[in-house]
């Protein structure tokens, strides 16, 4: 470092700032010399004087700055500000103020997974397509006996998967450990294309999968995968419980029927480079039949930043179960979005509440199945328990023991009509969404492009009547 003709170098301000606040919220700053330090605790009680100060910048100099008669060596140049010629001031503490250096640099999180191409062929898709990760099928089959309502056969789920696995690349009795662990959004939509209101766009998605997945058994695989989804709803092993968000596709490496997919799991989709030199950047796109602008449907306007959601909509009519999936944008957060879903899918909500218990073979209700609240309250012989003793078994054991039989009665799972998860957000205001027809091989498919999508998947939220 060349200091020129300067004889004095100042590192650190030699002072500490202290902020005082009074009961009225007024703020004043004071500076004290380094030996005095700064208070660590609140002065007084309530909203009294609160002291807060940044540590002296000289505190972190040992190990970072080495001074000799001929030179000054700075080990870590991160956050060093040269305020004037020959005068170096350590302006930013590397530990406490690192956010000032990184807050404007968007982070990116990539994920990679190896999968069979049964349900996701990356060569037929473009970068930006949402990809879904599937849990192991034994997890769903193992939970079906306990979740299936009485009167329904939990083995139907096992049989549906067995029929689907017969068309798998690895076969039904696979011992290699490889499985189709990833599911493309287009394959999922194509498997239930008959349930969408936009019939033409949905049929275009199915035609795209049949034409570009390059497997003569693709049509059978679509039909059996749709039947597998129906069996999951019938046994109350809902699909969303065994699916998570993988991210937005950006690149892939494929050999035969085995592919390694890389996707954006966190951060802006456009921030990652693809392996296509012609299109180095990608935006998120979804099939037009599976896109839903919630604010537009509710006539709330479009001028605001929006969240991006993935929605599963269920219909629990016995033997005619329905599964639809949508990618929706809305300015509502996770809590308020549930009311919007309830309003938009009121038909599915009502039908699931009415028909969710169809086929239940439950025993006849016992005459004393209802809680005899009036009789208990009017009888002086029945024991009582004060609220302060509810955790004491000596008092609660003497109370009337009521164990209702809920078999065959509506419950939370029998009335479930939807589930959604927040995928991320569109930071631009207003958000840029464009619908146009794209060419996939020999098929034209209408899609909706979403720009500046920042991936940040959250947890599933279930909707019941």
Swiss-Prot record:
Structural component of the T=16 icosahedral capsid. The capsid is composed of pentamers and hexamers of major capsid protein/MCP, which are linked together by heterotrimers called triplexes. These triplexes are formed by a single molecule of triplex protein 1/TRX1 and two copies of triplex protein 2/TRX2. Additionally, TRX1 is required for efficient transport of TRX2 to the nucleus, which is the site of capsid assembly. GO terms for cellular component: host cell nucleus; viral capsid. The lineage of its organism: Viruses, Duplodnaviria, Heunggongvirae, Peploviricota, Herviviricetes. The gene is TRX1. Interacts with TRX2, MCP and capsid vertex component 2/CVC2. It comes from the Viruses. One of its GO terms (molecular function) is DNA binding. Keywords: Capsid protein, Host nucleus, Virion. It is found in: Virion; Host nucleus. This is Triplex capsid protein 1. The keyword Lipoprotein does not apply. GO terms for biological process: viral capsid assembly. It comes from Equine herpesvirus 1 (strain V592) (EHV-1). Its main location: virion. Belongs to the herpesviridae TRX1 protein family. InterPro entries: Herpes_1 (IPR004999).
């Amino acid at each position: 470092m060349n200091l020129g003709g300067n004889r004095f170098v100042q590192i650190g301000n030699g002072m500490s700032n202290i902020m005082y606040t009074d009961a009225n919220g007024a703020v004043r700053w004071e500076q004290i010399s380094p030996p005095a330090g700064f208070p660590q605790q609140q002065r007084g009680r309530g909203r009294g004087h609160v002291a807060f100060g940044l540590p002296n910048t000289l505190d972190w100099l040992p190990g970072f700055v080495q001074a000799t008669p001929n030179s000054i060596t700075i080990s870590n140049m991160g956050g060093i500000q040269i305020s004037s010629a020959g005068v170096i001031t350590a302006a930013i503490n590397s530990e406490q103020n690192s956010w000032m250096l990184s807050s404007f640099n968007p982070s990116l999180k990539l994920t990679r997974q190896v999968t069979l191409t049964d349900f996701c062929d990356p060569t037929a898709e473009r970068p930006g397509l949402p990809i879904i990760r599937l849990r192991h099928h034994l997890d769903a089959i193992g939970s079906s006996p306990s979740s299936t309502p009485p009167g329904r056969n939990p083995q139907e789920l096992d049989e549906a998967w067995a029929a689907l696995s017969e068309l798998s690349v690895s076969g039904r009795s696979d011992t290699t450990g490889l499985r189709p662990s990833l599911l493309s959004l287009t394959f999922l939509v194509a498997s239930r294309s008959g349930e969408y209101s936009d019939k033409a766009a949905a049929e275009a998605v199915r035609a795209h999968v049949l034409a570009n997945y390059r497997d003569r058994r693709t049509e059978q695989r679509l039909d059996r995968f749709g039947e597998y989804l129906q069996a999951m709803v019938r046994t109350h092993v809902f699909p969303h419980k065994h699916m998570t968000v993988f991210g937005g596709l950006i690149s892939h490496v494929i050999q035969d029927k085995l592919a390694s997919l890389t996707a954006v799991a966190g951060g802006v989709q456009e921030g990652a480079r693809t392996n296509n030199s012609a299109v180095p950047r990608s935006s998120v796109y979804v099939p037009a039949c599976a896109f839903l602008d919630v604010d537009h449907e509710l006539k709330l306007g479009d001028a605001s930043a929006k969240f991006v959601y993935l929605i599963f909509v269920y219909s629990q009519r016995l033997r005619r179960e329905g599964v639809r999936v949508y990618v929706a944008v809305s300015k509502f957060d996770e809590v308020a979005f549930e009311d919007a879903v309830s309003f938009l899918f009121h038909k599915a909500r009502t039908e699931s509440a009415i028909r969710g218990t169809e086929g239940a073979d439950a025993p006849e209700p016992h005459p004393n199945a209802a809680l005899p609240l009036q009789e208990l309250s009017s009888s002086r012989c029945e024991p009582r328990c004060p609220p302060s003793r509810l955790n004491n078994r000596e008092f609660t054991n003497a109370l009337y023991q009521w164990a209702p039989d809920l078999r065959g009665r509506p419950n939370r799972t029998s009335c479930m009509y939807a589930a959604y998860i927040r995928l991320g957000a569109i930071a631009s205001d207003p958000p840029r969404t464009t619908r146009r027809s794209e060419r996939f091989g020999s098929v034209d498919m209408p899609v909706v492009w979403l720009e500046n999508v920042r991936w940040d998947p959250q947890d599933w939220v279930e909707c019941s009547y």
